[in-house]
């Protein structure tokens, strides 16, 4: 029994030693960005569903970015006006009501303290006593007098007297501060109401972007339109490609931004947006889509952000509308359905067909592959023409040499005949 107990003890000690030896050491590694962690190799089953692409800009134009761990919050207070304008309406209205209520209560308290310190509360029924504010018999009446003073609605039952210098000074201070509060809060509300963000609601983008041939070149296209009769002045369009990349040194750059040329050098990016327009991007060697084919497009994790800017004709304020397209919203081999028709004396736009597309014959190769095929098709033709020209030149030189030899032979025969005749 003692031996059995000793053997069991040895086994347990050996297991504990093995566990101590085999216990892994926790090594803390730097945390990579989410997209970098997603791109790391992992064992994934074949029936795994495709990972959904996270938008950088939503279809309605709002940026899908949240700022966290912002420690220097005092910076928001240094620009308090913009902070109030950017707040939601419910918070803005709450602050609007609270600011006026607090100022009325604050100055009402001061008016009540002046009356209390002067002893006006003790001589309410004394007709020979001249109070600072007549008929001020408590805090409620002082609060009402503060409202009448700051809103300048006019004095009635309660009036300040000329026997109270401290009341006159407080009246001046409240009048000035009340004007400042009115200017600040009313200005804030006016700016928030007149913001051109709502104007962007009537600037529409097509739900899909398309890739098809235009004038013999592969192009990426999307459509924009304005629903209002008052137009956008100095309208301009630009587009950016949002795609993560890894440099040759191994640096991972999340959400790298690349400009997409939509006519910057030709002036086509400046729009006269009276009717819907199709914005075209030619896929050439400078395009980020140069090597992307139809089969490769669904595998790409990219996002195209389009930005339309201009001035509102009615107010002159700058307006910006945004939208985006991910790979699932880019249709290869499609075109947009025409929406503009000529009626009796005017053009009519059918916005029911604004987002509609139809299929068209488009090669599934990338623009780079199409250019290589075109160059290969031109090489044999140029080679055959040059070879024929070279052969023709060689034949001409050979004929000239033969003619020269025949002429020399004839000249030699004539000379021999002349010598024989002389002899």
Curated annotation (Swiss-Prot):
Q: Which UniProt keywords apply?
A: Congenital generalized lipodystrophy, Disease variant, Intellectual disability, Ion channel, Ion transport, Membrane, Phosphoprotein, Potassium, Potassium transport, Transmembrane, Transmembrane helix, Transport, Voltage-gated channel
Reaction(s) catalyzed by this protein?
K(+)(in) = K(+)(out)
**Cell location:** Membrane
Q: Where is this region: Disordered?
A: 390-423
Primary place of residence?
A: membrane
Tissue specificity is: Most abundant in cerebellum, and to a lesser degree in islets and exocrine pancreas.
Q: Which GO terms describe its cellular component?
A: Golgi apparatus; plasma membrane; voltage-gated potassium channel complex
Query: Which stretches are Extracellular in the membrane topology?
Result: 115-138, 158-166
Pinpoint motif PDZ-binding by residue range: 420-423
Keyword set includes Phosphoprotein: yes
Q: Provide the GO MF annotations for this entry.
A: G-protein activated inward rectifier potassium channel activity; inward rectifier potassium channel activity
| Family to which the UniProt record says this protein belongs | Belongs to the inward rectifier-type potassium channel (TC 1.A.2.1) family. KCNJ6 subfamily.
Question: What role does it play?
Answer: Inward rectifier potassium channels are characterized by a greater tendency to allow potassium to flow into the cell rather than out of it. Their voltage dependence is regulated by the concentration of extracellular potassium; as external potassium is raised, the voltage range of the channel opening shifts to more positive voltages. The inward rectification is mainly due to the blockage of outward current by internal magnesium. This potassium channel may be involved in the regulation of insulin secretion by glucose and/or neurotransmitters acting through G-protein-coupled receptors.
Q: How does it assemble?
A: Associates with KCNJ3/GIRK1 or KCNJ5/GRIK4 to form a G-protein-activated heteromultimer pore-forming unit. The resulting inward current is much larger. Interacts (via PDZ-binding motif) with SNX27 (via PDZ domain); the interaction is required when endocytosed to prevent degradation in lysosomes and promote recycling to the plasma membrane.
Illness: Keppen-Lubinsky syndrome: A rare disease characterized by severe developmental delay, intellectual disability, severe generalized lipodystrophy, dysmorphic features including microcephaly, large prominent eyes, narrow nasal bridge, tented upper lip, high palate, open mouth, tightly adherent skin, and aged appearance.
Name listed for the protein in its UniProt record: G protein-activated inward rectifier potassium channel 2
Q: Which gene encodes it?
A: KCNJ6
